[in-house]
């Protein structure tokens, strides 16, 4: 099971770099389809990517700060999972893409509202964040500090 979950993480990491990869094997449509782009605001928990992918018990409001800090320190990409189960990867609005970790690190383990340009392509979601703020009224289930 751990091998399978590890493989899932590797596949998702590839999806960050090549968004169409996840459906390429099962989808016969062109991988060159343009991404859908819109201005939007999302709300979710800033966390590392490993836990929501590998831990099937993970939710948008439940986390271990000890694990989160260790994964972030080790370089795990940061993402924003929402209450409805969507996972948003932060990207730059310019090419080449620049590191968005600096923008998210102050919000690690916090529930946020992020506004910007949202991109969707074949089930993968990304956001070029223009504005981000912590939402204080969300009850988080934090296992440890």
Feature roles, as predicted:
Residues 22-145:
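OB-fold and OB-like single-stranded nucleic-acid-recognition modules
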Residues 2, 6-20:
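Bacterial N-terminal signal peptides
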């Amino acid at each position: 099971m751990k091998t399978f979950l590890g493989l899932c993480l590797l596949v998702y990491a590839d999806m960050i770099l090549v968004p169409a990869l996840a459906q390429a094997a099962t989808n016969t449509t062109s991988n060159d389809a343009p991404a859908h782009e819109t201005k939007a605001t999302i709300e979710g928990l800033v966390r590392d990517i490993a836990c929501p992918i590998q831990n099937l018990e993970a939710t948008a409001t439940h986390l271990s700060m000890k694990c989160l800090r260790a994964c972030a320190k080790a370089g795990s990409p940061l993402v924003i999972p929402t209450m409805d189960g969507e996972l948003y990867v932060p990207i730059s609005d310019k090419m080449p893409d620049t590191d968005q970790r600096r923008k998210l690190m102050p919000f690690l383990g916090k529930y946020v509202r992020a506004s910007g340009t949202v991109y969707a392509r074949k089930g993968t979601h990304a956001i070029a964040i223009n504005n981000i703020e912590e939402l204080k009224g969300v009850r988080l289930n934090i296992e440890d500090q």
